[in-house]
Amino acid sequence: MKRILLLILVALISFSCKKKYQPRTIESIKITEFKMDSTSIRAIHAFNKNKLVFAGSKGAIGTTEDGGKSWNIKRLKHNDSIIPNFRSLAINENNGLFALSIGNPALLYNIGLNKEEIVYKEEHEKVFYDSMHFFDAEHGIAVGDPTDDCPSIILTSDEGKTWTKLPCNQLPKFEEGEAFFAASNTNIAIVNKTVWIASGGTKARILKSTDYGKSWEIYNTPIIQGDGPQGIYSIDFYDENNGIAIGGNYAKPNDNCANKAITKDGGKTWTLVAENQSPNYKSCVQYVPNTNGKEIFAVGKTGISFSNDGGNSWTEVSKDPYYTIQFVDQNTAWLSGHEKIGKLSLP
């Protein structure tokens, strides 16, 4: 009995003495930059340190499989006349590649090695799709600005073979002037079957579904809202409860008032953080993997900022302008911007 008690005591002491994760202090970073001529890139999918896919303007779809040493870039054209401007890109768990264009007509491509197939097309004077993601191998979602009095949301449940637009009677109503921002393909966040979408304009709100996008709730936020290009540009969730939203006013990028907030209850309520402090306007925010929700990067045309306390305080680590960032592990991330891709390697 004494031996058993001793073993239990040793195990408890060992467990309690395990080193807790200590967030890093990062004051500057180095990014390896790859020039991409004649395309502005707001949508990327990073597989690992070596493999990345991007979708950009002027129909550009690009890939690297050797960490950026070489690139394969193709440019798509519809009916030999329409050049799609891509701002949405998604990969399902079976590695199906999908790219969605903004503007009229909206063109959603399934892109293979030797062919490109349009699996969804929508024509409307107001059509404008902003971002797209997959939950898993079968279920996917894309969101766009209202063509009626509700957001445009299309869903797939067959690996992207077919897409269906939800009717307005199944969606929350939008205020006049409320829409989404196609800035970084990150105004959607997904954890398991739950999806959150962030809006801006006259209202800055969070839409939430816990059933692959079939039914919806909507919540208010204290993020700046009103006239013009202000609101939430990007969201990310570390788990089903803890998330962060960031944005601001694109027309006043140096303002840092009411442009970042966190939630601890799955998006129902939001609290402003770092009020009247950096960072200012940002188009993308992402948690660093395996850092217990403490380390966060935010990027935009105003530079790159880092937080090691869950978003409460920030440090500007670079003035380089980028639209979006995506981590593949605790130390490696890919970024994209105007005519460039970046690769960040942390120590």
Mark where each language-model region is:
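Repeated scaffold domains used in trafficking and secretory/extracellular systems
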Residues: 41-43, 84-89, 126-133, 229-234, ...
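Blade-level signature of beta-propeller repeat domains, shared across WD40, Kelch, NHL, RCC1
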Residues: 327-347
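Beta-strand-rich domains and repeat architectures in extracellular enzymes and scaffolds
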Residues: 33-59
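Bacterial Sec-dependent N-terminal signal peptides
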Residues: 1-29
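Short, solvent-exposed loop/turn segments at conserved positions within beta-propeller repeat blades
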Residues: 103-104, 146-150, 200-202, 252-256
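Entry beta-strands of beta-propeller and related beta-repeat scaffolds
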Residues: 51-53, 95-98, 138-142, 194-196, ...
